[in-house]
From Swiss-Prot:
UniProt keyword terms in alphabetical order: Hydrolase
Record-stated family: Belongs to the 2H phosphoesterase superfamily. ThpR family.
Matches recorded under NCBIfam families: 2_5_ligase
Species name: Methanocaldococcus jannaschii (strain ATCC 43067 / DSM 2661 / JAL-1 / JCM 10045 / NBRC 100440) (Methanococcus jannaschii)
UniProt-recorded name of the protein: RNA 2',3'-cyclic phosphodiesterase
Organism ancestry: Archaea, Methanobacteriati, Methanobacteriota, Methanomada group, Methanococci
Function: Hydrolyzes RNA 2',3'-cyclic phosphodiester to an RNA 2'-phosphomonoester.
């Protein structure tokens, strides 16, 4: 099964982001469904039942932290856009990631090189009008969705369908 760890976003902020995503409704861009908006902590990929049991036995709980959601960014860079995201800011987020990454590496998962806390709002399949997209990103680069308190890390199962992924919570720490 395909798994990832994430921090949920409060419903009111999801609503705001869903309205904001309208600015990026363009040919070639697949927007993330409102119910699927989250901050990915770590993508685990395909995991078998045995490894899942090991993950479920880990303590991945976190202390409550305030996370600011602001600014627009892109991966891998502004000249070759594949992902459009909103930044997630709190100095402890990177530390939380490192702790979780370390615990998972002990189970055989590959360590990540660098963690950029973010919330993906869209994936670019192809760009019909690169200038229009870059102008839109520039126009909204300082967007601010405020902050919220994160109290949990959730383990999600992701089932890919022709209509997009379906996420199911397996465990909450």
């Amino acid at each position: 099964m395909r798994l990832f760890l994430a921090i949920d976003i409060p419903e009111n902020i999801k609503e705001e982001i869903a309205k904001f995503q309208e600015q990026f409704k363009m040919k070639g861009i697949k927007l993330v469904e409102k119910e699927n908006l989250h901050i990915t902590v770590k993508f685990l990929g395909e995991v078998d039942e045995e490894k899942l049991k090991e993950i479920l036995n880990l303590d991945l709980s976190i202390q409550p932290i305030k996370i600011k959601l602001k600014y627009i960014g892109t991966f891998p860079n502004s000249n070759y856009i594949r992902v459009i995201w909103i930044g997630a800011y709190n100095n402890n987020l990177v530390e939380i990631f490192k702790e979780i990454d370390e615990k998972l590496s002990n189970l055989g998962f590959k360590k990540e090189r660098e963690y950029v806390p973010h919330l993906t709002i869209g994936r670019v399949k192809f760009i019909d009008n690169k200038k229009k997209l870059k102008d839109r990103i520039e126009k909204y680069k300082d967007v601010d969705f405020g902050e919220f308190e994160a109290k949990h890390i959730k383990l999600y199962k992701s089932t890919l369908t022709p209509n997009g992924p379906i996420y199911e919570v397996i465990k909450e720490w």
